[in-house]
Amino acid sequence: GVYFQAFYDDGFCCLMENEITKKYYAMGQEPYIVLQNAKEIDAYKIYKVMVIDYENRAALERLRDAVAKEQFPFDSFFSSPWFYEFCPKGQNKGAGITWLVKHLGIAMKDTIAVGDEENDVSMIEAAGIGVAMCNARKEIQAHADFVTTRDHNHSGVAEVAKKFVLEAQ
């Protein structure tokens, strides 16, 4: 079944430790706390909730479809085939790159963003050049200015750097 984790500045919290917790921890060694009850979550400044199902993406898609029918004060999207995330409205990668270019004093037209999942769409659309990896689903690729011929495990980002940075000079 589905499992959830709530993220705060120092890691994530969950209601039970199980194989999903351990698998997620093994990916990034992010510290976590097992809560004794759901009310304890109020002690943390949560910035994201992730619903995980490593075995049944269809369950996550049903959740996405149900959420889409409602008016909630948050954005939701897939960040991988197994992770469906919720965060406050407007806290996304597109907002992040917009803030960063202002902070650094550079023009948005001079940026490149590369992504492969729903959580990358806002960034791909915001960047001067939005790139989708070839292994991204077609609906993600539709938002991009360019689609790589290689995926992220086979030098896809290097392909982007060569085409838009090295060869452009």
Predicted regions and their residues:
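Conserved acidic, metal-coordinating active-site core of Asp-based
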Residues: 1-114
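Mg2+-dependent phosphoryl-transfer enzymes with acidic/Ser/Thr/Gly-rich catalytic loops
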Residues: 85-169
